[in-house]
């Protein structure tokens, strides 16, 4: 194993009174615990990859950490679960640095037109970007030197621009649309 992408996630954008403990446990289990468990399970193989010079990476699909209360108030449980993934990035990047394993987070600037989007009432897919933007950003990021590029919280379009891709219009569900819906956790 040279690359681990922790993308699995459970979502419930509900306030505290409307979040059953079963839903809370699901989000924490899939998002935070799942990221930790998968990373732990792959660690020996990732260390072997590093020893063989194969540039190992862990990429968590999780947001930049921000303690601004407006990200917590509407959906404390979901924010805690997603930030649990981001805290894995923060801790594992430092822990795994001596072994030459990169650990980074990647997050979309805008809403992405995926099946998960259908769980959010009232979101128009025409205001979103396609999943390909995240795939392309991940591809570029995972090619970077693991020893030099770790512990970062990156945004998809910034990664692409850093790699010379300036025209992002093709990633929009509706090309030419400049009114894209910002994703959660983007300040």
Go through the PLM ranges and name each one.
Residues 47-98, 110:
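Catalytic loop of short-chain dehydrogenase/reductase
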Residues 98, 105-106, 122-187:
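C-terminal helical subdomain
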Residues 7-13:
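Conserved NAD(P)H cofactor-binding loop of Rossmann-fold oxidoreductase domains
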Residues 39-40, 90:
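A short, exposed helix-loop element centered on a Lys and neighboring polar residues
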Residues 15-16, 20-25:
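Substrate-binding pocket helix/loop in short-chain dehydrogenase/reductase
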Residues 14, 69-70, 101, 105-120:
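Short beta-loop-alpha junction of Rossmann-like oxidoreductase domains
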